[in-house]
Amino acid sequence: MVAIGENQQAGTLHVSPTTCWELSVATQKGRVAGRPHLGEQPVARWFREAISVTEAKIIPIKQRISCEAAQVVVTTGHKDPGDCFLMATARVSKLSLVTRDGIIRQIAGADPNYLDIVVC
């Protein structure tokens, strides 16, 4: 969380729109450990407000990121579409990916040059 705060203060906090999709999917799950608690707000509103408050910059998903997301599957064997788009966005944008996802952490641990992460 320190890294998020530091990037926020520096004006260099970036977010993928895939994060909104991931939040939406996660909140639709039943009582699962680690499920996000966004209160009664719809995810879209919560995400929009979070972007506004943090002044994060949204990185649009363009062709290069989409192609890289497909390559993530080939390179890592990981087939979760959201994770692949998040990793592709970080790789193409040359940014660290903030995550607590165990599989993404394994991928980054196996080859730190492939993906830079910040564990939260």
Locations of regions flagged by a protein language model:
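Short, polar loop motifs at secondary-structure junctions
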Residues: 100-104
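PIN-domain endoribonuclease scaffold, especially VapC-family toxins
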Residues: 1-79, 84-96, 106-118
